[in-house]
Amino acid sequence: MAYDMVIKGAKAVTPDGVIEADIVVQNGVIAEIGSDIEASGTEIIQADGKYVFPGVIDCHVHFNEPGREDWEGFETGSQMMAAGGCTTYFDMPLNCIPSTVTAEHLLAKAELGRQKSAVDFALWGGLVPGHIEDIRPMAEAGAIGFKAFLSKSGTDEFRSVDERTLLKGMAEIAAAGKILALHAESDAITSYLQMVLANKGKVDADAYAASRPEEAEVEAVYRTIQYAKVTGCPVHFVHISTAKAVRLIREAKQEGLDVSVETCPHYVLFSHDDLRQRGSVAKCAPPLRSRQSKETLIETLIAGDIDMVSSDHSPCRPSLKREDNMFLSWGGISGGQFTLLGMLELALEHQIPFETIAEWTAAAPAKRFGLQKKGRLEAGCDADFVLVSMEPYTVTRESMFAKHKKSIYEGHTFPCSISATYSKGRCVYNDGEKVTEIDGALVVPS
């Protein structure tokens, strides 16, 4: 039988393990996976023993469009994600102007994505003071969930929530059948410590890290779990950086609460030492932790207590990455291209099965957010997959697809590389070359 595409000789990373297989694609969907399939195709791809992973589903990126396209934007951002093996990303509601806090804003943003994105995408709505009544209309317009900050967001347009807004908003999100994504750092702790340190003239990397201690994350997670008990709101804790907070989330799961947690590659690949040595390219919130805390977080991840890994790609204009005052420097790491590669580096260092990496980067987010046709190499799923070569790759400015090249990953050598990425059977990245065809669609739970 003739098909649109047949990938021959792949090491397919399936939920049941890695298998030697051919992958057959028809009409943008995986038609069959198996050994020595007798099928012809319009396009035959010889995988030559490369690993084939399900396309990454990154639940946490900031593309800043509309309004701050000079920071990133859908066009360069989606091409960057494709270069990293990502076939679906969730764009956050802040750093764009206007923030995505009404159904009108969400629908307008979705149309921009359709016009410019190389791969599929979802959109977070925002939970901010004064917009609780907009939650249900945004849910009906296609929001994948709602994002809130307990500490300052970094932009004036997207305000952090007070306790009443958080509680009422969580009740409304629960009623709408959606999920709250929470930036869990205590504003009381972080603002107070920053004031104390800045008043003493301490504004370097050590001062910044000291102003956002693990206790700020733990307090915010604990408080939100209590609100989840009261409201019944499902919660997804984003970019958790400390095992102490993960333990609270694990206990909440054991009590039957509907909670999940992500961490980011930079929290398991880098440490506070990198912020000291590299400066503002390593600034993020929560901050990179000590080497010991990093190792403990890795142990927690390997133990299965963290559901998924997302990039929290948060770029800016290079001029905003100041070195003279770490408090005033933009806090975000540009790294959306390196999630899968970073986790594969971790896998090889710690003997983590590749199917576990596929779970963290694809299957778990698909399951959590109801994307039933994504996240797995299985017949009937979207033909979203990435070919990985076990050839080392050193990140250069020329090989970065993000709009701006100021990144902690510059100069980093990964033990493997992305050879090609396919979204619904279309090649969207091939061996260092971006593919400019636009076919990204807004995805919603199915």
UniProtKB/Swiss-Prot annotation:
Keywords: Hydrolase, Metal-binding, Purine metabolism, Zinc. The modification N6-carboxylysine is found at residue 147. SUPFAM superfamilies: Composite domain of metallo-dependent hydrolases (SSF51338), Metallo-dependent hydrolases (SSF51556). Carboxylation allows a single lysine to coordinate two zinc ions. Zn(2+) 1 binds at residues 60, 62, 147, 312. It comes from the Bacteria. Pathway: Nitrogen metabolism; (S)-allantoin degradation; allantoate from (S)-allantoin: step 1/1. One of its GO terms (cellular component) is cytoplasm. The keyword Hydrolase applies. Its EC number is 3.5.2.5. Binds 2 Zn(2+) ions per subunit. Its cofactor is Zn(2+). Belongs to the metallo-dependent hydrolases superfamily. Allantoinase family. This is Allantoinase. The lineage of its organism: Bacteria, Bacillati, Bacillota, Bacilli, Bacillales. The gene is allB.
